[in-house]
Each structure stands twice: as structure tokens, then as C-alpha cells.
């Protein structure tokens, strides 16, 4: 049996095999309208039903498919005309769209011929098992029945995870049948029988080949009842799926017993029941090609197929081959994106995301090729040109739904597949589609096929074709869905050679490179002094036959000369020859002179490696290890063998951070380090940003902080134990495994409880013991103290002055706000503080002023309180009012200053009684001044007092009283305020103009017939408006301001009987006040003294001459 070459992820199709690209070979006899309606009904079923897989035998390559189909037609079964084909296709419109292709039609007719020939064979042969074995030996394909109803229900689902397909039967529910196994190889069905039963039940049967073209298509057909009985004998534990416990009953079906009876009467059909899983695992695997030949059908797919089959049987209107009415009656699966779009666009229920309006079937639209949302063409144009659609940092505009960036703004209304511009709407087609085949390629998939659906919205469905892929190890081939990017794995071992080149990979079939070899080997170094255990494949190709690696030690093996050992690092064999051999040494030890020149000068020739090398006698000059890059030290000895001696110079070395340098003898460099540490401290900040480095002679590039953070975490209980870091500390990782409850225990947080978690909130009433017995209104809480009680009560104030109401219970000390007025311990004063708590005076004496009246003036003492002591003698600080004789002048004077005449009175009294003092008599001066004399003290009158006195005399002379006002001075002066006068002085001309306007307005209203008359002043500033308002009050006018700044103006209104002009204008008053005043008259003191005989002693004392008290006359 010839097999097709393995194909790994690629497709091989014959250009003549049009069956795998549907719609390419159409029936030529159909017109365009008929064919379009056929495609429309076919595309609806293809969208929302399982795609029929292309089941092919594994021994037939894709290139020979067309040849198989060409020879599969039997005589008399070929369609005679296109109309006949059209009629036959109408009978099976519920099948998949691929059924209507010529190759599918020929395939169905081939099986009908096969059934007829099998019936003839069944008459000649009585043993059905023999026929079955002969059919297996004749062909490697599985005996399958492809009726129009079965082709639709074939489903093959590849493993989406890329694993090896399991050896399970492909189960689908057929009309009137139980579970049916499809797609099995003949060799696999043969494996189901044990060798013993196969020998017993199989015998050769001669089959005559009447037609060479049908030789490859002859397959025996056996009675299904006989097959079922034979299978029950071989597998007694097998039950139909509807009898399995927990199996889902088939909708719309009769009990299995009645169905089987009805199918037995219907006629013979080939039906192979599936193999149970237990038997399937026990069946041995004979070839690698049989392992992945079948796909597994999931339970969900079987359930969906059952429901779809039930829907097709119950609703015959859905299976109508031609769309009738306004809407397209195709079977749509609303669970898919495409089906939902078709339904919403057809019923005009789809909304444009830009304008939120419904998309009409006749409106131009645009569909996004990324998310497949549909928009109005005009709406998407406006959106693309708006600033909100521009992508940040990219050129183009964003889709409103998926934010996919597009470069070009759509300007043309096209169908969904993009082939037709401005498609016309037809009630028999999907709105906004062209009605032709989509033909779009699957983006991003390795699939050469194009979409064979009619022009549709939404994404194209997966490719329904199948291909053969080779597994990752290349030993088996599997049939998978075309375009799926899954990798195929088998259950065999990989067996590829590992990196070591000796062992094979023992893992199951996998992708990518194999893992390194895991076998541990013991290797020895080249010199044999060290060994190690490594993985197999380490240092492959470095072995010298004795060792496998270098230990980096001195080799130490004896050289061929026998006198020296190898001084090289451990290396592969063999060792280099002795470097001191005569034929290898050509220069003197310092390397400056060739040995040939030294031999000419009489040096002895070397014969062995042990002979010394002749010296040239020059300075050695080899560079030493000391010195610097600028000045290299050299050996100062004469040409010699061996190592150079120590250097006698000094070298400059730098500290570790290169901040300081110092000189050291070269001889001490070997014993000491070439670097030293300076005392400079690093001032850079550490990575934490909180601390400084402070390391001595620091050379770190990243200054890591070695301290522990130590900051408190959010829980408030623990501290951060991580190294000092930037930013916020992490959350506390501590957790409690005890239940966290509220105070009353009603609410619980079960462990683990993160550290810092607050107790749960509880809605129960607080159950704690409270200080008062008032009702509790607050909930259970975790705080230690309960909220204050807010129950309103009556409480006395702290000073017991009054009983206050509506006081919350938690308030203890209440002040009424009144003075305390409690008697102080001094017994003279009362507490002046507001109502307070506790004693009035705490550790202090009363400091209120003493109220005891003085003996001289009667004013209080005003000294700090002294209850047990007499009042101290101090000057009285009380203020008294003094007046002049006329009463015009009044001043407040301190009482002690008013009695300043005490000294003068004492001097006068002593002068008068000086004789008595000379005689030794005492003089009492306390009686010289009394309270009456102090109260009679007066101030001196000034010039204004004299002018007032003169006016008073003139008034008396002209008989002018205070009530009369002949010059109208009081009335004019009282009408103009001081502020108005001050404002008028700033702009006297403006005031004069305003007064003229007001006088004219008042005269006009008094003389005219109207009771009111108004005048509008032009716009002006605030100060001028204020002057107008003040003058209007003087003239009795009404003034109102209108408009807003800077056009605000004033309108004055005169009212008859109310508005009167003042007797004196403001302008004349200001001019009179600004004129120069004449000097005041000179007062006449003699006349004043005569008029005032009762003047005070103070005035007399001031006017008297100075008395010379020491001018004593005998």
C-alpha cells in the first residue's frame, strides 16, 4: 500500500482539483440569480453549522484526489443535465454547502453504486464477517456511508493545544441512528479483532472485477443488525451512548428500542459503532501512521450538533432553499459575531457608535477590519478628521471601538469584501453586501484558501479544509485543520541525538531543541592531578585521550630530556620539548647577543640542556614588575640566567581611590600591597538617599546602604526589616491565624488576618458598661472609650447661679456666662471672673484697688487691696474737670496736679506768721487749704473767651437774644456738613455749576404747572456723584444713580412744595470761610477785673508781683 509523502505544516493541492476550493467549478446550466440564491442559502448554513471535514484515506495524496473523484462515478448515476443536478441538490439543502459541489455529488453516487454491488455480494456470501475481512484486505480505507444527511454532521476537531490526537471514535448523531464512527482506517478496524477470532471468522472470498474503473471503489456492505450483534458478541460490556449513565437524552427522539426496530425495517445501511474507551486503550498500536489519524469530538460540539439537528427537524421553514419575504431566512447563529451583525443589520437594529443612530439598510457604511464594527460612512469621516481621533505619537486616526490606528480616511462606500463600490440593497441578500463570494484570505495564517462564504460582515470563519502535518519528531503524520498554528506531538520518544553526540533524547515528541544530556560523567584533567563530575557533553572535543579539561595548575611532568619538568599550565598531551636544549637556545640570557657571536669570541659550545648559557657581559635590561606606566624599571645586573634580583629604585603607588600617592622602595612592593588606603571619607549618598557612605577610601560605584530600614510599617506594630531603601516600605507580611472579632463577638474575620487589619464593623448596639444609665444609641466599636453620651439633661452651672436645660450628658463643667460675684477673703471685693470652677483665688491675694475714700479729696485710695493696713499716702490719680471763669474752657486734670497751689499757700501762710515761728510757736498748715478751695480752682480765660465776652456785651447792647438769628448764620451753617464742605473745596467750580442747575430746577417746578421735574447730569466719577447727592438733600431734591461704570450718572427730581433753595449757597459759605480774618480785640484786664470781683485765688496769685520773703524790715 503506497503512502503519501509526509507533509509538515504545508499543503499540496492539484490545480485541477477544484473540489477543495468551493465555488470554482459551478454548474454551467444555472443562471446567475438561481446560483446566487443557492449560494445565499448555502452560506447561511455554512456560517452557523459545523464545517464538513475532508476525510481522505492516508494512502491517497492530495494530488490524486481529482483522479479518485473522476473514477468514482458509476454508470447510470451521473447527472444527465444541470437541471437534474439542481433538483437533486434541492433535496439535500439541509446539508453543508460543499455537498452541492460536483465532487461531493459524485462521491454520494459512488456510495450508492457501492451499496448495490454489496447487496449482490451478500447474496453470494452468507458469512458477513468474511465479507468484512475481504473488504479490509482489498482497500486501506474505512467503509463509510456518505448520505446527504450524514455529510453535514461529520465533525473533526483537532487538539487546539497541539497535543497528539487521541485514538477515540468520532461520534455524531444521525437521523434515526445511534452514535456512528467515521473516518477510521481499515487497518485500525482490523485491529479490533483478536487474531484468534480473525482466523475463525475470516475466510477468503473471490470477488470478480467487472469494471477496472470501479475496482478501487468496491466495498462490501453488511447488514447493520448483523454488525451490531457481532460487535455485542466481541464487546459484551459495550452499551449505546443513550444507555450510559448521565448521558444526555436526544431531543425529539423515540426510545432507542423503537428506533432500532424502525431502522431495521428501513433497509440495510452500513453503521459501525464506536469502540469503548477501555477497549480503545487496550488495543495495541501497530503503526505510527495510525496514532494521530482521528480527531476527538468534544462534548460541547456534540451537544451543539444535536441541538442544530433538532432545530432543523422541528422548523421546516428554516430549511427552505429559497429566501422568501423581506428578510433572508438563513439559519443564523446569534452567538457568533457575524450572525449577530447580520441579524442586527437586517432588522435595522444596529447602532452607529459615533452618532448613536440606527444603521439603515440603504445608508452608506464603513466596517473596521480590526473589530468589524459598522459605522455610517459620513460619521466615520467626521470622526477621522476630528482632533479627538488622532493617535498619540502616531500618524493616522483611531477607530472609535478598538482604537486601531488607520492611515487613510475612508471615502468610498464598498461592500464588506471590498470588491463592489456602492452596492445596491436587495431584500434577498445581506445588507451592504455584494452577494458574491467573499474570497478574502485569512490574515496571519498559513492557509492558501480564501473565504468561501458570501460577502458578509464580521470576521471570516476558520478554513474548513484539512491537511496532514508531521509531528515534531518527524515520525508520524496527523490530519489537522488548515491554517491552525498548532504544533503536532505524538506519543513516541524523540530519539534525537543530544548535544553530547552519544545519547538519545528520551522525552516525548516535543518542539524546539532537545534538553542537554543529563548523564553525569567523571572527568580527569590533562595532568591527572584533579578530577570533576560534569554533565555529559561538557567540553566536548577537548579530550586528548587521557584528560578532558585543564586544572590551571603547573603541569610538572618530566620532559624528554629527563632533567627538567614541564612548567606550563595543565595542557593536553604531549608536553613541549625542553626549552634549554642547545638547538633551541640561540641568544644569551638577556637576549641581546646571539650565541653564534659569543662562540666566535671563544665561548664554549653547549652540548646538553644542563650546560650553562654563555653570558654576553652587558647590562641585563629586562623590564621589572615595579615602576609605573611612564617610567618602567629595568634590571641593572649583568647578563645572567634565572630571575632578576630586586630593584633598588622607588615606585610611586596610589591609594585605592586614587586620591593620594606615596613612594615605596621597590623591594617592599612584593611584601606589601601595591595599593594603600587613604583617610578620605566618601561623602556621596547611598542608594537609600537617607545616609551618606562615610567609607574610608571608597571605590564603590553603587553605594549600597548596609543598614536596616527600621521604619514603622502601615500596621503600626512592626518595623521594616529590609535594607535601607528609597520610597515607601512594603506592606507588613505578618499575619495572624486567630479569629479577629468585634468587641461583642458578633462580626468575625477568619484567619489568616493580615497585620494591621482593623476589627470588623458591627451593626449591633454597644454592649459595654457605661457611666450613665441613659439609652445607648451608638453601635459596637473597637475603640477603648465609647462616644460621649448626648442625652439632654438639666445641670447647675459651676457657680450655682442657675439650672440650665438641654445640656448633653457628657458635659460636666458648665458656665452660665455671668460674673462670679462671690465675696473674696478680703471681705471688701467680689470675684470679677465669669462663672468658673473651683476657688476664686488660688495661692494669691486680692489685687483689686482699695475703695476707701481719701480724706483730702474724697476719691478712692486705688492702692492694691490692704484689708488690715491703713491706706498708704500717695498722690491721687483720679481725674477731675477744671473750667475757666466763663465756662468755655474745660480740661481733665489729675487731682494731685489740681492741688499744686499747696506750696504757694504754705509759703504765704508762713510769711504772714514768720514772727510767730521766730518766737517758737508752731504753725498748722493743714488748715490753710481745704477741699472747698481745691474745688474752686479755675482755669485762666484765653483770647477767645475775651472775644466771646465782647460779643456778649454787644448783644446785650443791641438787645439780641439767643433765640433770634438776624443774619441767618445758624440756619445756613447747619445745612452743609463738614464732609460736603471738604469735597466742595476740592472742586469749587463744579459745585457752583451744580448749584445753579438745582436753583433753576427748583424755580422751574415752583413756577410751572407740573408737580415734578427732573434733570439728568452727565456721567461722572464717584466723588462728583456724592457731592450731587449731598446737595440734593440740602435742596430737598430726589437723587438716583443709573447705569454702570464708567457711564454711571445722577438724575435729580424737584417736587413742588418740598424742594426749596437754601438762603445761602455752599459756594458763598466756603468763600466766606476762606477769607482772611481780622485780628481779635485786645482784652481789657482792668475792666475784666472790676467786672469779676469773685475771681479765684489762682488768678490773683498769677497776677501778683513776686514777693521777696528774705527782705525783712525791722
Curated annotation (Swiss-Prot):
Biased composition annotated in UniProt, kind: Polar residues: 72-103, 121-142
Region (Interaction with PABPC1 and PABC4): 9-26
Keyword Transmembrane listed: no
Signal sequence region: none
Region (Disordered): 20-220, 232-287, 299-325, 1071-1095
Subcellular location: Nucleus
Ranges annotated as NF-X1-type zinc finger: 447-465, 500-519, 561-580, 626-649, 688-707, 715-734, 826-848, 857-878
GO CC annotation terms, alphabetical: cytosol; nucleolus; nucleoplasm; plasma membrane
Modified residues (Phosphoserine): 50, 81, 92, 126, 130, 147, 320
Functional note: Binds to the X-box motif of MHC class II genes and represses their expression. May play an important role in regulating the duration of an inflammatory response by limiting the period in which MHC class II molecules are induced by interferon-gamma. Together with PABPC1 or PABPC4, acts as a coactivator for TERT expression. Mediates E2-dependent ubiquitination.
Family membership noted in the UniProt record: Belongs to the NFX1 family.
Protein name: Transcriptional repressor NF-X1
